[in-house]
Amino acid sequence: MTSPQDKRRALTPEALAMMDTIARTGSFAAAAREMGRVPSALTYSVRQLEDTLDVLLFDRSSRQAVLTSAGQELLVEGRRLLQELDAVANRVRRIATGWESELTLAVDDALARRAVFDLM
């Protein structure tokens, strides 16, 4: 039986990006071309991921890469996680460079508030 730590280690950003590429391109061959790998390497990686998670991610009865319901769930959540990772990296970079994520405006009564809001 695979431990929870092993399952977490298998769900790398690279594995999630691979799943996204396969689903987006519709085939292992097209995904492999896009990723600069050979199809057998992707097939092996997907099988390793399936074995670790103990689920089938793709229906192999057709030539196209068709996700199972478990594969679809991993794709949706994986895309969300990849977006979160990108957002974290952007926030860290902004903090490191001194870019402020908040802007505070003080508006005097001499300015029409509506005009200020229109500028935003």
Language model segments and positions:
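The N-cap/first-turn positions of alpha helices
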Residues: 12-15, 39, 71, 78
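Short alpha-helical "packing" element that flanks the helix-turn-helix/winged-helix DNA-binding module
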Residues: 15-22, 74
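Alpha-helical residues within the helix-turn-helix
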Residues: 33-34, 51, 72
